[in-house]
Protein backbone atom coordinates (compact mmCIF):
# COMPACT_ATOMS: atom_id res chain seq x y z
CA UNK A 1 0.00 0.00 0.00
CA UNK A 2 1.42 3.38 -0.94
CA UNK A 3 1.66 5.83 1.88
CA UNK A 4 -0.92 8.65 1.71
CA UNK A 5 0.21 10.34 4.89
CA UNK A 6 1.19 14.00 4.94
CA UNK A 7 4.82 14.56 4.00
CA UNK A 8 6.73 16.55 6.61
CA UNK A 9 10.08 16.15 4.82
CA UNK A 10 9.56 18.73 2.05
CA UNK A 11 8.36 22.31 1.86
CA UNK A 12 8.73 25.51 3.92
CA UNK A 13 9.17 24.56 7.57
CA UNK A 14 7.66 27.62 9.25
CA UNK A 15 4.43 27.32 7.30
CA UNK A 16 4.29 23.55 7.74
CA UNK A 17 4.87 23.67 11.49
CA UNK A 18 2.19 26.34 11.90
CA UNK A 19 -0.35 24.41 9.83
CA UNK A 20 0.53 21.20 11.66
CA UNK A 21 0.36 22.79 15.11
CA UNK A 22 -2.80 24.90 14.87
CA UNK A 23 -5.32 22.01 14.76
CA UNK A 24 -3.33 20.21 17.46
CA UNK A 25 -3.28 23.39 19.52
CA UNK A 26 -7.03 23.75 19.12
CA UNK A 27 -7.44 20.11 20.13
CA UNK A 28 -5.37 20.61 23.26
CA UNK A 29 -7.14 23.85 24.17
CA UNK A 30 -10.53 22.21 23.74
CA UNK A 31 -9.40 19.33 25.92
CA UNK A 32 -8.33 21.78 28.63
CA UNK A 33 -11.55 23.78 28.31
CA UNK A 34 -13.66 20.66 28.57
CA UNK A 35 -11.67 19.60 31.63
CA UNK A 36 -12.14 23.09 33.01
CA UNK A 37 -15.86 22.68 32.54
CA UNK A 38 -15.71 19.94 35.17
CA UNK A 39 -14.17 22.36 37.65
CA UNK A 40 -16.34 25.30 36.59
CA UNK A 41 -19.62 23.39 36.84
CA UNK A 42 -18.66 21.95 40.23
CA UNK A 43 -17.45 25.31 41.54
CA UNK A 44 -20.51 27.23 40.38
CA UNK A 45 -23.28 24.69 41.08
CA UNK A 46 -21.94 22.32 43.75
CA UNK A 47 -19.99 24.72 45.96
CA UNK A 48 -16.41 25.19 47.21
CA UNK A 49 -16.30 21.83 49.01
CA UNK A 50 -16.94 19.90 45.79
CA UNK A 51 -14.45 22.18 44.00
CA UNK A 52 -11.82 21.34 46.60
CA UNK A 53 -12.58 17.61 46.22
CA UNK A 54 -11.97 17.71 42.48
CA UNK A 55 -8.91 19.93 42.89
CA UNK A 56 -7.41 17.56 45.45
CA UNK A 57 -7.27 14.83 42.80
CA UNK A 58 -5.52 16.94 40.14
CA UNK A 59 -2.03 15.63 40.85
CA UNK A 60 -3.16 12.01 40.76
CA UNK A 61 -5.10 12.59 37.55
CA UNK A 62 -1.91 14.09 36.09
CA UNK A 63 0.01 11.03 37.27
CA UNK A 64 -2.27 8.64 35.37
CA UNK A 65 -2.91 10.71 32.27
CA UNK A 66 0.73 11.81 32.08
CA UNK A 67 1.90 8.24 31.69
CA UNK A 68 -0.61 7.65 28.88
CA UNK A 69 0.46 10.85 27.13
CA UNK A 70 4.05 9.62 27.37
CA UNK A 71 2.99 6.36 25.75
CA UNK A 72 1.49 8.36 22.91
CA UNK A 73 4.66 10.37 22.36
CA UNK A 74 6.68 7.19 21.95
CA UNK A 75 4.17 5.85 19.43
CA UNK A 76 4.32 9.15 17.55
CA UNK A 77 8.11 9.09 17.15
CA UNK A 78 8.34 5.45 16.01
CA UNK A 79 5.49 5.72 13.49
CA UNK A 80 6.72 9.08 12.15
CA UNK A 81 10.23 7.76 11.58
CA UNK A 82 8.99 4.79 9.54
CA UNK A 83 6.69 7.06 7.55
CA UNK A 84 9.62 9.36 6.78
CA UNK A 85 11.71 6.38 5.68
CA UNK A 86 8.82 5.10 3.47
CA UNK A 87 8.84 1.71 5.25
CA UNK A 88 5.12 0.96 5.01
CA UNK A 89 5.25 -2.56 6.44
CA UNK A 90 7.09 -1.27 9.49
CA UNK A 91 4.43 1.43 9.88
CA UNK A 92 1.68 -1.23 9.84
CA UNK A 93 3.44 -3.31 12.48
CA UNK A 94 4.20 -0.31 14.70
CA UNK A 95 0.61 0.95 14.57
CA UNK A 96 -1.04 -2.37 15.43
CA UNK A 97 1.51 -3.23 18.10
CA UNK A 98 1.06 0.20 19.68
CA UNK A 99 -2.72 -0.14 19.89
CA UNK A 100 -2.47 -3.36 21.88
CA UNK A 101 0.26 -2.00 24.16
CA UNK A 102 -1.69 1.21 24.82
CA UNK A 103 -4.85 -0.68 25.70
CA UNK A 104 -2.96 -2.98 28.09
CA UNK A 105 -1.36 -0.02 29.85
CA UNK A 106 -4.72 1.75 30.11
CA UNK A 107 -6.34 -1.27 31.78
CA UNK A 108 -3.45 -1.60 34.24
CA UNK A 109 -3.64 2.08 35.23
CA UNK A 110 -7.41 1.81 35.62
CA UNK A 111 -7.10 -1.14 38.00
CA UNK A 112 -4.28 0.35 40.09
CA UNK A 113 -5.94 3.75 40.30
CA UNK A 114 -9.30 2.34 41.35
CA UNK A 115 -7.81 0.11 44.04
CA UNK A 116 -5.39 2.58 45.61
CA UNK A 117 -7.35 5.84 45.38
CA UNK A 118 -8.10 6.17 49.14
CA UNK A 119 -4.51 5.40 50.13
CA UNK A 120 -3.04 7.89 47.65
CA UNK A 121 -5.41 10.66 48.69
CA UNK A 122 -4.60 10.03 52.34
CA UNK A 123 -0.89 10.19 51.55
CA UNK A 124 -1.48 13.63 50.03
CA UNK A 125 -3.04 14.84 53.26
CA UNK A 126 -6.42 15.49 51.65
CA UNK A 127 -8.72 17.34 54.06
CA UNK A 128 -11.27 14.99 55.72
CA UNK A 129 -14.12 17.21 54.56
CA UNK A 130 -12.98 16.74 50.94
CA UNK A 131 -12.10 13.03 51.09
CA UNK A 132 -15.44 11.42 50.20
CA UNK A 133 -15.95 13.57 47.11
CA UNK A 134 -12.34 13.14 46.01
CA UNK A 135 -12.48 9.33 46.30
CA UNK A 136 -15.74 9.18 44.37
CA UNK A 137 -14.44 11.47 41.61
CA UNK A 138 -11.10 9.74 41.13
CA UNK A 139 -12.44 6.18 41.16
CA UNK A 140 -15.01 6.97 38.50
CA UNK A 141 -12.43 8.91 36.47
CA UNK A 142 -10.07 5.91 36.52
CA UNK A 143 -12.68 3.83 34.70
CA UNK A 144 -11.97 5.95 31.62
CA UNK A 145 -8.24 5.20 31.47
CA UNK A 146 -8.50 2.50 28.72
CA UNK A 147 -10.44 4.93 26.53
CA UNK A 148 -7.93 7.70 27.17
CA UNK A 149 -5.09 5.33 26.26
CA UNK A 150 -6.77 4.44 22.97
CA UNK A 151 -7.48 8.08 22.08
CA UNK A 152 -3.87 9.10 22.84
CA UNK A 153 -2.70 6.22 20.64
CA UNK A 154 -4.90 7.35 17.76
CA UNK A 155 -3.93 10.98 18.21
CA UNK A 156 -0.24 10.01 18.15
CA UNK A 157 -0.61 7.91 14.99
CA UNK A 158 -2.60 10.55 13.12
CA UNK A 159 -0.12 13.26 14.16
CA UNK A 160 2.80 11.11 13.02
CA UNK A 161 1.09 10.88 9.64
CA UNK A 162 0.68 14.67 9.57
CA UNK A 163 -3.07 14.66 10.21
CA UNK A 164 -3.87 16.85 13.22
CA UNK A 165 -7.40 17.81 12.15
CA UNK A 166 -9.29 14.58 12.81
CA UNK A 167 -8.45 14.50 16.55
CA UNK A 168 -9.78 18.06 16.74
CA UNK A 169 -13.09 17.03 15.21
CA UNK A 170 -13.42 13.98 17.45
CA UNK A 171 -12.59 15.88 20.62
CA UNK A 172 -15.01 18.66 19.72
CA UNK A 173 -17.88 16.20 19.43
CA UNK A 174 -17.00 14.37 22.63
CA UNK A 175 -16.34 17.62 24.49
CA UNK A 176 -19.73 19.13 23.75
CA UNK A 177 -21.31 15.93 25.06
CA UNK A 178 -19.08 16.22 28.14
CA UNK A 179 -20.30 19.73 28.95
CA UNK A 180 -23.96 18.82 28.50
CA UNK A 181 -23.55 15.76 30.71
CA UNK A 182 -21.70 17.85 33.32
CA UNK A 183 -24.67 20.17 33.60
CA UNK A 184 -27.16 17.30 33.64
CA UNK A 185 -25.40 15.19 36.26
CA UNK A 186 -24.55 18.13 38.58
CA UNK A 187 -27.61 20.39 38.28
CA UNK A 188 -30.36 17.87 37.57
CA UNK A 189 -29.03 14.72 39.27
CA UNK A 190 -27.14 16.53 42.08
CA UNK A 191 -24.15 14.16 41.76
CA UNK A 192 -21.54 16.90 42.42
CA UNK A 193 -17.96 15.63 41.89
CA UNK A 194 -19.09 12.14 40.90
CA UNK A 195 -21.30 13.63 38.19
CA UNK A 196 -18.49 15.42 36.36
CA UNK A 197 -16.32 12.30 36.57
CA UNK A 198 -19.09 10.25 35.01
CA UNK A 199 -19.51 12.81 32.23
CA UNK A 200 -15.76 12.71 31.58
CA UNK A 201 -15.49 8.96 31.11
CA UNK A 202 -18.52 8.83 28.80
CA UNK A 203 -16.95 11.48 26.56
CA UNK A 204 -13.60 9.68 26.68
CA UNK A 205 -15.10 6.46 25.37
CA UNK A 206 -16.87 8.39 22.62
CA UNK A 207 -13.61 10.02 21.48
CA UNK A 208 -11.80 6.66 21.60
CA UNK A 209 -14.50 5.03 19.46
CA UNK A 210 -14.30 7.85 16.92
CA UNK A 211 -10.52 7.66 16.53
CA UNK A 212 -10.58 3.87 16.10
CA UNK A 213 -13.36 4.15 13.52
CA UNK A 214 -11.32 6.76 11.64
CA UNK A 215 -8.21 4.56 11.54
CA UNK A 216 -10.30 1.59 10.44
CA UNK A 217 -11.64 3.58 7.49
CA UNK A 218 -8.36 5.30 6.65
CA UNK A 219 -6.95 4.87 3.17
CA UNK A 220 -3.43 5.73 4.32
CA UNK A 221 -0.52 3.68 5.55
CA UNK A 222 -1.77 3.95 9.17
CA UNK A 223 -5.01 2.07 8.47
CA UNK A 224 -6.09 -0.34 11.24
CA UNK A 225 -6.88 -3.88 10.12
CA UNK A 226 -8.22 -6.53 12.47
CA UNK A 227 -6.13 -9.26 10.82
CA UNK A 228 -2.91 -7.40 11.71
CA UNK A 229 -3.68 -6.92 15.41
CA UNK A 230 -0.72 -8.57 17.06
CA UNK A 231 2.34 -7.56 19.04
CA UNK A 232 5.46 -7.58 16.87
CA UNK A 233 8.35 -7.96 19.37
CA UNK A 234 10.85 -5.65 17.67
CA UNK A 235 8.30 -2.86 17.23
CA UNK A 236 7.10 -3.35 20.80
CA UNK A 237 10.66 -2.90 22.03
CA UNK A 238 11.07 0.28 19.97
CA UNK A 239 7.80 1.77 21.16
CA UNK A 240 8.33 0.86 24.81
CA UNK A 241 11.94 2.10 24.80
CA UNK A 242 10.61 5.57 24.01
CA UNK A 243 7.18 5.39 25.64
CA UNK A 244 8.13 4.09 29.07
CA UNK A 245 10.78 6.77 29.76
CA UNK A 246 8.41 9.44 28.42
CA UNK A 247 5.54 8.07 30.49
CA UNK A 248 7.72 7.79 33.57
CA UNK A 249 8.92 11.34 33.03
CA UNK A 250 5.35 12.62 33.09
CA UNK A 251 4.38 10.33 35.95
CA UNK A 252 7.42 11.27 38.04
CA UNK A 253 6.63 14.93 37.47
CA UNK A 254 3.23 14.17 38.94
CA UNK A 255 4.83 12.28 41.84
CA UNK A 256 7.06 15.27 42.59
CA UNK A 257 3.97 17.44 42.40
CA UNK A 258 2.38 15.21 45.04
CA UNK A 259 4.85 16.73 47.49
CA UNK A 260 3.91 20.19 46.23
CA UNK A 261 0.22 19.39 46.71
CA UNK A 262 1.00 18.16 50.21
CA UNK A 263 2.65 21.52 50.83
CA UNK A 264 -0.45 23.33 49.55
CA UNK A 265 -2.62 21.13 51.76
CA UNK A 266 -0.68 22.37 54.79
CA UNK A 267 -2.48 25.71 54.38
CA UNK A 268 -6.17 26.38 54.98
CA UNK A 269 -9.04 25.31 52.73
CA UNK A 270 -9.19 28.72 51.02
CA UNK A 271 -5.60 28.35 49.80
CA UNK A 272 -6.26 24.76 48.67
CA UNK A 273 -9.33 25.86 46.70
CA UNK A 274 -7.54 28.90 45.24
CA UNK A 275 -4.64 26.72 44.13
CA UNK A 276 -7.08 24.26 42.53
CA UNK A 277 -8.74 27.05 40.55
CA UNK A 278 -5.49 28.71 39.44
CA UNK A 279 -3.86 25.40 38.50
CA UNK A 280 -6.24 25.24 35.55
CA UNK A 281 -4.06 27.90 33.94
CA UNK A 282 -1.12 25.48 33.99
CA UNK A 283 -3.02 22.96 31.91
CA UNK A 284 -4.13 25.65 29.47
CA UNK A 285 -0.62 27.03 28.88
CA UNK A 286 1.13 23.66 28.85
CA UNK A 287 -1.29 22.08 26.42
CA UNK A 288 -1.10 24.96 23.95
CA UNK A 289 2.69 24.70 24.04
CA UNK A 290 2.50 20.90 23.86
CA UNK A 291 1.18 21.22 20.30
CA UNK A 292 4.52 22.74 19.34
CA UNK A 293 6.40 19.99 21.16
CA UNK A 294 4.46 17.34 19.24
CA UNK A 295 5.27 19.18 16.02
CA UNK A 296 8.93 19.28 17.01
CA UNK A 297 9.19 15.53 17.65
CA UNK A 298 7.05 14.61 14.60
CA UNK A 299 9.01 16.79 12.17
CA UNK A 300 12.37 15.78 13.58
CA UNK A 301 11.46 12.09 13.55
CA UNK A 302 10.09 12.04 9.99
CA UNK A 303 13.07 14.00 8.71
CA UNK A 304 15.48 11.79 10.63
CA UNK A 305 13.90 8.78 8.94
CA UNK A 306 14.29 10.55 5.59
CA UNK A 307 17.90 11.58 6.31
CA UNK A 308 17.18 15.34 6.10
CA UNK A 309 19.72 16.62 8.61
CA UNK A 310 19.20 20.35 7.98
CA UNK A 311 15.44 20.09 8.37
CA UNK A 312 15.98 18.25 11.65
CA UNK A 313 17.83 21.05 13.43
CA UNK A 314 15.76 23.80 11.81
CA UNK A 315 12.59 22.09 13.05
CA UNK A 316 13.96 22.33 16.59
CA UNK A 317 14.84 26.02 16.46
CA UNK A 318 11.56 27.02 14.82
CA UNK A 319 9.59 25.02 17.38
CA UNK A 320 11.58 26.56 20.22
CA UNK A 321 10.85 30.09 18.99
CA UNK A 322 7.13 29.39 18.66
CA UNK A 323 6.77 27.76 22.08
CA UNK A 324 8.72 30.54 23.82
CA UNK A 325 6.61 33.23 22.15
CA UNK A 326 3.37 31.47 23.05
CA UNK A 327 4.48 31.20 26.68
CA UNK A 328 5.23 34.93 26.89
CA UNK A 329 1.89 35.97 25.39
CA UNK A 330 -0.23 33.59 27.47
CA UNK A 331 1.63 34.48 30.66
CA UNK A 332 0.95 38.17 30.13
CA UNK A 333 -2.74 37.54 29.45
CA UNK A 334 -3.13 35.41 32.57
CA UNK A 335 -1.46 37.98 34.81
CA UNK A 336 -3.51 40.86 33.38
CA UNK A 337 -6.85 39.04 33.25
CA UNK A 338 -6.29 36.65 36.14
CA UNK A 339 -9.34 37.71 38.14
CA UNK A 340 -11.63 37.20 35.17
CA UNK A 341 -10.07 33.78 34.56
CA UNK A 342 -10.56 32.70 38.16
CA UNK A 343 -14.17 33.88 38.16
CA UNK A 344 -14.92 30.94 35.86
CA UNK A 345 -14.20 28.55 38.71
CA UNK A 346 -15.19 30.38 41.87
CA UNK A 347 -17.31 33.30 43.03
CA UNK A 348 -15.68 33.43 46.48
CA UNK A 349 -13.42 36.49 46.77
CA UNK A 350 -10.97 34.93 49.24
CA UNK A 351 -10.47 31.92 46.95
CA UNK A 352 -9.82 34.21 43.97
CA UNK A 353 -7.24 36.18 45.97
CA UNK A 354 -5.44 32.96 46.85
CA UNK A 355 -5.52 31.89 43.20
CA UNK A 356 -3.96 35.16 42.03
CA UNK A 357 -0.84 34.46 44.09
CA UNK A 358 -0.20 31.37 41.98
CA UNK A 359 -1.08 33.07 38.68
CA UNK A 360 1.37 35.94 39.24
CA UNK A 361 4.30 33.67 40.07
CA UNK A 362 3.57 31.09 37.37
CA UNK A 363 3.11 33.87 34.82
CA UNK A 364 6.82 34.62 35.24
CA UNK A 365 7.74 30.94 34.93
CA UNK A 366 6.06 29.41 31.87
CA UNK A 367 8.62 30.66 29.33
CA UNK A 368 11.36 28.64 31.04
CA UNK A 369 9.38 25.45 30.53
CA UNK A 370 9.47 26.05 26.74
CA UNK A 371 13.25 25.59 26.68
CA UNK A 372 13.00 22.41 28.72
CA UNK A 373 10.06 20.68 27.06
CA UNK A 374 10.91 21.56 23.46
CA UNK A 375 14.42 20.20 23.96
CA UNK A 376 13.05 17.01 25.51
CA UNK A 377 10.78 16.61 22.46
CA UNK A 378 13.78 17.11 20.18
CA UNK A 379 15.79 14.42 21.96
CA UNK A 380 12.82 12.07 21.70
CA UNK A 381 12.37 12.88 18.02
CA UNK A 382 15.94 11.74 17.47
CA UNK A 383 15.14 8.46 19.20
CA UNK A 384 16.70 9.21 22.58
CA UNK A 385 14.46 9.13 25.62
CA UNK A 386 16.30 7.48 28.52
CA UNK A 387 18.98 10.08 29.33
CA UNK A 388 16.60 13.06 28.89
CA UNK A 389 14.23 11.32 31.28
CA UNK A 390 16.98 10.86 33.87
CA UNK A 391 17.81 14.56 33.56
CA UNK A 392 14.18 15.49 34.15
CA UNK A 393 13.95 13.17 37.15
CA UNK A 394 16.99 14.79 38.76
CA UNK A 395 16.48 18.40 37.69
CA UNK A 396 12.74 18.83 38.01
CA UNK A 397 11.55 16.00 40.24
CA UNK A 398 14.21 15.19 42.84
CA UNK A 399 15.11 18.87 42.99
CA UNK A 400 11.48 19.81 43.71
CA UNK A 401 11.23 17.32 46.55
CA UNK A 402 14.46 18.66 48.05
CA UNK A 403 13.10 22.21 47.71
CA UNK A 404 9.88 21.31 49.53
CA UNK A 405 11.80 19.86 52.48
CA UNK A 406 14.40 22.63 52.64
CA UNK A 407 13.45 26.04 51.21
CA UNK A 408 9.69 25.66 51.68
CA UNK A 409 10.09 24.02 55.09
CA UNK A 410 12.21 26.97 56.21
CA UNK A 411 9.97 29.81 54.94
CA UNK A 412 6.62 27.98 54.84
CA UNK A 413 4.97 30.56 52.60
CA UNK A 414 2.94 29.74 49.52
CA UNK A 415 5.25 31.98 47.47
CA UNK A 416 8.31 29.95 48.47
CA UNK A 417 6.48 26.81 47.33
CA UNK A 418 5.49 28.16 43.90
CA UNK A 419 8.98 29.53 43.17
CA UNK A 420 10.37 26.01 42.84
CA UNK A 421 8.79 25.78 39.36
CA UNK A 422 10.88 28.48 37.72
CA UNK A 423 14.10 27.32 39.39
CA UNK A 424 13.64 23.65 38.49
CA UNK A 425 12.66 24.44 34.89
CA UNK A 426 15.72 26.63 34.37
CA UNK A 427 18.11 23.99 35.73
CA UNK A 428 16.54 21.17 33.72
CA UNK A 429 16.41 23.20 30.50
CA UNK A 430 20.14 23.89 30.65
CA UNK A 431 20.97 20.22 31.20
CA UNK A 432 18.60 19.07 28.41
CA UNK A 433 20.23 21.44 25.92
CA UNK A 434 23.65 20.05 26.72
CA UNK A 435 22.26 16.55 26.21
CA UNK A 436 20.66 17.48 22.86
CA UNK A 437 23.94 18.86 21.53
CA UNK A 438 25.59 15.51 22.14
CA UNK A 439 22.64 13.46 20.85
CA UNK A 440 22.41 15.54 17.67
CA UNK A 441 26.09 15.04 16.87
CA UNK A 442 25.86 11.29 17.47
CA UNK A 443 22.71 10.82 15.40
CA UNK A 444 23.93 12.97 12.50
CA UNK A 445 26.98 10.74 12.14
CA UNK A 446 24.60 7.91 11.21
CA UNK A 447 23.07 9.88 8.31
CA UNK A 448 24.38 10.54 4.80
CA UNK A 449 25.11 14.15 3.79
CA UNK A 450 21.93 16.22 3.38
CA UNK A 451 21.62 16.76 -0.35
CA UNK A 452 18.19 18.43 -0.38
CA UNK A 453 18.84 21.41 1.87
CA UNK A 454 15.99 23.21 3.60
CA UNK A 455 13.79 26.22 3.14
CA UNK A 456 13.29 27.54 6.64
CA UNK A 457 10.72 30.20 5.91
CA UNK A 458 7.38 30.33 4.19
Placement of each model-derived feature along the sequence:
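Short runs within selected transmembrane alpha-helices of multi-pass transporters and secretion channels
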Residues: 72, 141-159, 167-175, 196-209, ...
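Helix-terminus/linker motif at the lipid-water interface of multi-pass membrane proteins
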Residues: 29, 33-51, 121-128, 184-191, ...
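Short alpha-helical transmembrane segments in multi-pass integral membrane proteins
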Residues: 1-21, 79-146, 188-244, 300-365, ...
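Transmembrane helical elements of multi-pass membrane transporters/channels
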Residues: 19-38, 140, 174, 203-207, ...
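Small-residue-rich hydrophobic transmembrane alpha-helices
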Residues: 51-111, 148-167, 261, 274-332, ...
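N-terminal transmembrane alpha-helices
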Residues: 8-45, 59-74, 78, 103-110, ...
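Interfacial/gating helices of multi-pass transporter permease domains
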Residues: 42-62, 128-133, 193-194, 198, ...
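Hydrophobic transmembrane alpha-helices of multi-pass small-molecule transporters
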Residues: 63-66, 178-182, 208-212, 284-287, ...
Amino acid sequence: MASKSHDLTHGPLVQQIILFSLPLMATNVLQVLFNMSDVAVVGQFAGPEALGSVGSTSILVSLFTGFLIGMGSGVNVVVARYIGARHDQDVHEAVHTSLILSLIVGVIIMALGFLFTPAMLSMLGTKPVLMAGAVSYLRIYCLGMPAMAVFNFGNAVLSAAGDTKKPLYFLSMAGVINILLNLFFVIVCHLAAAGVALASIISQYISAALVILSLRRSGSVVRLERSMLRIEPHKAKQVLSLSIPAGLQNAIFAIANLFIQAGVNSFDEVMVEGNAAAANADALVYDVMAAIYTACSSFMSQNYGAGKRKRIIHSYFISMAFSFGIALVMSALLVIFGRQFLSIFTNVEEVAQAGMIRLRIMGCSYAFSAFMDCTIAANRGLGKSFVPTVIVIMGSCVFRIIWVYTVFAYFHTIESLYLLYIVSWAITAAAEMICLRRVYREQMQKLPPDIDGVKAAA
